[in-house]
Amino acid sequence: MKKSLKDLTGLIVAFALATLLFLYWPLYQRSVPKANNDTPVDVVLIGGGIMSVTLGTYLQELQPDWKIELFERLNGIAQESSDGWNNAGTGHSAFAELNYTPELQDGTIEIKRAIKIAEQFEISREFWSHQVRHGRLPAPTEFINATPHMSFVWGEDRIEYLRKRHNALIKNPLFYGMQFSTDPAVIQQWAPLLMEGRTQDQKIAATYMPLGTDVNFGVITRDLAKHLQYSQNFALHLDHEVTALRQNPDKTWNVTVKNLNNGQERSIKSRFVFIGAGGAALKLLQLSGIPESKDYAGFPVGGQFLSFENTAITKRHNVKAYGMAESGSPPMSVPHLDARKLDGKSIVLFGPFALYSTKFLKKGSWFDLYSSVNHHNAAGMLSVGKNNIDLVKYLMKQATLTDADRHAELLKYFPNAKPTDWTLVTAGQRVQIIKRDPEKGMILQFGTEIVMDKDHTLATLLGASPGASTSPSIMLDLLAKAFPQQMKNGWETQLKKIIPSYGQHINDSPALTNKIRRMTSETLSLPYLEVPDKSATPPDPTIAPKHQHSPTHNANSEMQAL
């Protein structure tokens, strides 16, 4: 008996020591090579995705004499979440994503988030238009195409919600032209695949926004990166992984990188570092050791879609149709049937289906999640798991899905679909932010967030959606936070040439909305609708008589979707 107790005590002590070692690892900083440049470069960009490349494009125009170096661990640009196959490509503009417009307890629809995202996407259109005019992006149809955005629901409560959402949004210039209908014949004209084979007694409703787009962020990223390399002040290093970040007494940074082709390490000194490495950004932020890094953790979630390439199907679906998550499901489960342009051909994708993975990147390590856990965030991560049990249950359920289960979900949006029509494809990884709140402790936070050190010498972008589609706006925020003096000393004036609406809210003025959209629509070969001075709304298609219902809450309480 005593021997058993002694053995048990020994096991407990060993487990406790192993846990402490795990949470406090590494116990000391390893030695790294000294920087091989006495004069620091101006900026180091980590990660070859759309965020780093967008920031580099801004900086190259604002300060062409600055020396910029970009390090990417893979052998090409935009191979992770920025690649067209690894994201939804929606051009998130809040036209269709119902989780951006929750229903409040009093029955009204909150539209502030939707307006903000719509304005951010207009900034993206301005930025891309500027790059097209200056030859940094190819013909617009290679990366952005007119693709109407739809919201599609069934059931009286959800129809009533969608009606109220439509009424709230169309009072705003950015949403002028959005149509609402409960008429199956009208909805079938908009999206035949949604309606064919559907029972006639099912009550349905949809909104239709002709100004929606499909965006290939991989094309944008690769072409902008190609043009960055035309400058002798820019250097791109592929197959180079950042392994250490150390701040010097003079506030510069030594960035240690490993050449993955020969295994050699070297360090480069930089005045400013941007970590735009997608899912890997959290671990790199932790490598920096800045105090702000202790307030964050991350939870990875992968995504899968059903892919349709048969032209008999793809030629009959030219919209992005977003539904609403089932009651009790997390917002990342919002289903959508999307028309896409990928690899030069039309594709239809349906999903997402969550994929449990401990990787932070699609081409990452299974140990990514575990290596991000430390004594600063371990307890908080456990607390977040306990407080988000619906998400945990959802992921567990998704892990057990069969092809028959996925097809059953598909039939809700494409009633005539056959199992032989589609193949299952794996998209990119996303890492949800877990952040320390001053009052609530660690919480699960949706969206993206810029984390910056107090010296404004290192910045990291954490989070996911809406992400790529609002990258020019996000990087504008970063410029303002990281380089306030340069902004005052001339950058703001230059930015108004790149982003004509800079410093203004597009949605505040029909005249400004028309001016900006007319310009970007012409440059990007996209449809344009003139907003009347008083934002008068166009006549709705046939609408069934309004039913009275008690208020119901939008199933998507958090503002996030894959």
Curated annotation (Swiss-Prot):
- In what pathway does it function? Carbohydrate metabolism; tricarboxylic acid cycle; oxaloacetate from (S)-malate (quinone route): step 1/1
The reply on keyword Flavoprotein is: yes
Q: Which Pfam families match?
A: Mqo (PF06039)
* The protein's required cofactors: FAD
**Claim: Cell inner membrane is one of the keywords in the record:** no
GO biological process terms, alphabetically, are: tricarboxylic acid cycle
Q: What class of enzyme is it?
A: oxidoreductase
Q: Which Gene Ontology terms cover its molecular function?
A: 2-hydroxyglutarate dehydrogenase activity; L-malate dehydrogenase (quinone) activity
* Catalytic activity, EC: 1.1.5.4
List the residue ranges of the region (Disordered): 530-562
Q: What catalytic reaction does the record list?
A: (S)-malate + a quinone = a quinol + oxaloacetate
Biased composition of type Polar residues is found at: 551-562
Q: Out of the domains of life, which is the source?
A: Bacteria
Q: Which keywords does the record carry?
A: FAD, Flavoprotein, Oxidoreductase, Tricarboxylic acid cycle
Q: Which InterPro entries does the protein's record reference?
A: FAD/NAD-bd_sf, MQO
Q: Which family does it belong to?
A: Belongs to the MQO family.
UniProt protein name: Probable malate:quinone oxidoreductase
Organism name: Xylella fastidiosa (strain 9a5c)
